[in-house]
Amino acid sequence: MDLKKKIREVPDFPREGINYKDISTLLLDGEAYRQAVQELARQCRYKAADLIVCPKLRGLVIGAPLSYILGTGLAVLQRPVRLPGDALSWQGMALGEDSFYLSREAVKPEMKVLVADELLATGGTAFTAIKMIEELGGEVVGTVFLIELTGLGGRAKLNDYDTISLVQYNF
């Protein structure tokens, strides 16, 4: 199945000249969604991750099923108001976010961690997750994305980490 055909492109959104990649059409097709997640899991299985870290909302649609299939734990980067207890924060997020927070209990020293998200563009979100994981003593064993917008520098920003993406768009 050509997964790219299952992703709707919305022209001139959020602004003129941008073609938004809408994964909701892929998510609505159960077989396409299952195939995408199973293929990502197949490519990630050898990494022997203990934990998947993903950003809240869109990252969860990839991170949660991957965690289930791979039998790992799941930790979610989120806003502080939603996270009780001691949390690590990181400033300077991409996409206009001021910061993300990760529970300090989520990542243990030497834990093998896979970062998952639905989209790789500039790499800012994934890079932030990586820095937080490493500060907590975890070992990032790779990054995984459903979609990659090539040409925005995301893969280069993550050059020190094995990066997997299923669908690529020239951007």
From Swiss-Prot:
It is an enzyme of class 2 (transferase). GO terms for biological process: adenine salvage; AMP salvage; purine ribonucleoside salvage. One of its GO terms (cellular component) is cytoplasm. GO terms for molecular function: adenine binding; adenine phosphoribosyltransferase activity; AMP binding. It catalyses: AMP + diphosphate = 5-phospho-alpha-D-ribose 1-diphosphate + adenine. Pfam families: Pribosyltran. It is found in: Cytoplasm. Keywords: Cytoplasm, Glycosyltransferase, Purine salvage, Transferase. The keyword Membrane does not apply. Pathway: Purine metabolism; AMP biosynthesis via salvage pathway; AMP from adenine: step 1/1. Disulfide bonds: none annotated. Its EC number is 2.4.2.7. CDD domains: PRTases_typeI. InterPro entries: Ade_phspho_trans, PRibTrfase_dom, PRTase-like, UPRTase/APRTase. Homodimer. NCBIfam families: PRK02304.1-5 (NF002636). Catalyzes a salvage reaction resulting in the formation of AMP, that is energically less costly than de novo synthesis. Belongs to the purine/pyrimidine phosphoribosyltransferase family. This is Adenine phosphoribosyltransferase. It comes from Pelotomaculum thermopropionicum (strain DSM 13744 / JCM 10971 / SI).
